[in-house]
């Protein structure tokens, strides 16, 4: 168990105590509706699964941010997946699935995939930035649609923001991890150590990991600390080369992720 739980502050939505103020309550509900994303499923996937929700799967892999999403696109999704849902935050957006997938790919926004070689694995790319105040609502929406047995979260942060008393620990594009109590897999390489205080995990990745800890769900977060402010090959490859956890540990064939 990592001692880093409690490193972040998570802003849960406040409940109203004044039930007499109906107008203010209505405004609050409208605001919450704007904060929640919407899943638009493909017609074929909806037909296959029927009205069965949440969708059960062995593993949910979340790529939060452009570096993690690009890594999943290159090493995980290329030719081995079908897009099953688009995740949108703008309620005015066109709800046609094919239109959304085409435009979301161009804008590198959020897509939910099902692996064709193992349809028990779901992969969600969340390339666009999710504001801090929306993290809780995104988390609730994700787990209202998907019920995984295990969760793997990939995300990134600037290396300049990592604090350590050991300068040798700060290497170019290094990976650290954080896990819930229920996570028991030894899937990380020997050089992958836990994120230590006073470092923090923020935003959607923190919200998802907190949810998994609360509900005793096995989950691990892999954070790539990158030198570049832009997505580059070195940062993307860090997930593959420096976090050599096995696909078999996530329900896939043997080999490196």
Curated annotation (Swiss-Prot):
Transmembrane segments: none annotated. Pfam families: PAC1 (PF16094). GO terms for biological process: proteasome core complex assembly. Keywords: Chaperone. InterPro entries: Proteasome_assmbl_chp_1 (IPR016565). GO terms for cellular component: endoplasmic reticulum. One of its GO terms (molecular function) is proteasome binding. Forms a heterodimer with psmg2. Chaperone protein which promotes assembly of the 20S proteasome as part of a heterodimer with psmg2. Belongs to the PSMG1 family. This is Proteasome assembly chaperone 1. It comes from Nematostella vectensis (Starlet sea anemone). The gene is psmg1.
